[in-house]
Amino acid sequence: MAGSRLETVGSVFSRTRDLMRAGVLKEKPLWYDIYKAFPPLREPVFRRPRLRYGKAKADIQDIFYQEDQIRAKFFATYGSGQKAFDLFNPNFKSTCQRFVEKYTELQNLGETDEEKLFVETGKALLAEGIILRRVREARTVSVRLQASSEGHEPQEDDDLAQRGQVKQEPETAPSPP
C-alpha cells in the first residue's frame, strides 16, 4: 500500500503548522508568514466530489461569433465548394473566408438587412470572378445529368417541361458499333 492519505485531512497550512509544532520541519516555508498574515476567505480543504448519475450538464456557455453565423449560413446555402484548401500556401483564403470578409466590408458600408446583405455579397463575389453554386441547384443538376444518362428524365423536369420552363432536348438513340 502506498502509505497514508493525510492529504485529504486538513489544509496544507494546517498540516505544515502541525509538522512545525512537532519539530519535523525545522524551518518555516517562505509562504508560511504571508499565508498567516493574509489567510484566504475560504480555507482550501479537500472535499470528495459528489457522484453524478446520468449525463452531467455542462455549465460552459457556447461561444458564437458573428462571423461563425455567417459561415454557417454560407455552408448551408453554398456547401463546402469544389475547391480544396491549399495548405501549402500561407496566403490562401477559402471561398468562405472571402465571403465573410466581403460580407463584413459591405456591412460596414451601412447595409443592415441580413438577407439582402447575404445576396449582395454573393453578387459582389460574382463580380470578382468567384462563382458560388447553391447546394440545391447543384443537386438538381446532378440528378438531371444522372437521369439523362440512364435514359429517362426525373419527375421534376417533366413538371417543369409541362409548364414550359425547361426546353427538352430530343433523345438520340446510341448508334450501333
UniProtKB/Swiss-Prot annotation:
Location in or out of the cell: Mitochondrion
Top-level taxon: Eukaryota
Any one of the GO CC terms: mitochondrial small ribosomal subunit
Modification N-acetylalanine, positions: 2
Location, primary (coarse class): mitochondrion
Transmembrane annotation, as ranges: none
Modified positions (N6-succinyllysine) in chain numbering: 83
GO MF, one annotated term: structural constituent of ribosome
Region (Disordered): 145-177
CDD domains: At1g26750
Pfam families according to UniProt: MRP-S23 (PF10484)
Modified sites of kind N6-acetyllysine: 102
Keywords: Acetylation, Mitochondrion, Ribonucleoprotein, Ribosomal protein
One GO BP: mitochondrial translation
Homology family: Belongs to the mitochondrion-specific ribosomal protein mS23 family.
Record-linked PANTHER family: MITOCHONDRIAL RIBOSOMAL PROTEIN S23, SMALL RIBOSOMAL SUBUNIT PROTEIN MS23
Assembly and binders: Component of the mitochondrial ribosome small subunit (28S) which comprises a 12S rRNA and about 30 distinct proteins.
This protein's name: Small ribosomal subunit protein mS23
Native source species: Mus musculus
